[in-house]
Swiss-Prot record:
GO terms for biological process: UDP-galactose transmembrane transport. Belongs to the nucleotide-sugar transporter family. SLC35B subfamily. Residues 1-40 are annotated as: Disordered. Pfam families: UAA. GO terms for cellular component: endoplasmic reticulum membrane; Golgi membrane. The di-lysine motif confers endoplasmic reticulum localization for type I membrane proteins. The chain crosses the membrane at residues 57-77, 97-117, 124-144, 155-175, 179-199, 215-235, 247-267, 285-305, 341-361. It is found in: Endoplasmic reticulum membrane. This is Solute carrier family 35 member B1. The gene is slc35b1. The keyword Endoplasmic reticulum applies. Probable sugar transporter.
Amino acid sequence: MSLTKKIKNEKSLKQEKQTDQLKSNLRNNNNNINNKSKPKDQNLNTLHYIKTHLKEELFFIFCVGGIYIFYLLYGLVQEQLNVTKFGTEKKVFGFTAFLLALQCFFNMVSAWLVSLVNKEQKDNTPFMKYGFVSMLLVISTFLSNQSIRYISYPTQVLAKSCKPIPVIFMGLLLFKKKYPFLKYIVVIVISLGISLFMLPKATSKKNIQFEGHDHLFGNFILFVSLMMDGVMGPFQDNLVRQYKPSATSMMLNTNIWNLGLFSIMAFARGEVSQAIDFILEYPEVIKLILAFCITSAIGQQFIFLTTNKFGSLNCSTITTTRKFFSILVSIFYFGHSLDNLQWAAICMVFGGLILDLYISYSNKKKGVVLSPIAAPVKHPTATTPLENKKSL
């Protein structure tokens, strides 16, 4: 009996060893298979990562190119409209309210088409809420465009780039806001740059297309335009925080108001009949008007696209650098004469704007949501387009 048991035990031990060996072999085979498949999986993940980021980078380049192309063209056309003299009588198309009403119509149609394509939800913002913001916007835009008749286009673009000044000034005066110390440094640098650029020596008649016009008056109405931007920004912030409208919806509703207000202004100033007579007498101006309106509408869509896809900080960086190139294009294309002091002033202003963007990026990394005050004011115009960010 003991011998039989011993034989059975040996057999069972042998079977257990064989079973363990089989299990071990299976485990090794599985490990080998997994090890072979891991590089393939990793390669697939890497390829997917590269393709995704390559698409994003190409799309970003596409957005940057769109903003640069259409807003640089817009700047050229805008200045061309204000300096071209038609006919033997050397008449200038000076019907600002009529022109801006047409621009708002094109912007409104553009926003409406985009909202249809995107099938956006209904905007819960009361329509009348857009009225006050639109009124400030109309005043700001009208004065900004009117100022080009008295000062050079580079001066206008440089001044309108300086949003930190009115935003901080109005924030302190009306809303008792507090800002980081570096923001005040930004304002000092930009203010000094603007002051140097606008010295009497720097604003001689050779820089002004309409001789005899008072550049001091042009600077004054430009200053009022900037103050309107400073007042308008916080009200827009509040509207966006409270009702959360989409960028396209805000563009559409604001431009409906703008169209109505600019139309009233154009009729009140007697511009409608005069502008139509001018167009009939000099039909070549139609090409400039259409280019002005179309580049504005398309450029705005690129602004919205960039903000929605890549954020307001990236969009602010693009628009800030774009304004710098707009000044350069205007200087070289139209032959504006600048001295060394003015070039230094331009560098100071854009240096301050870049510092403002750097502060905003640094705060974002620290988890502090602080939009660049150098960013374009969020309203749908061609000069300072809307940004679709609640943090703005």
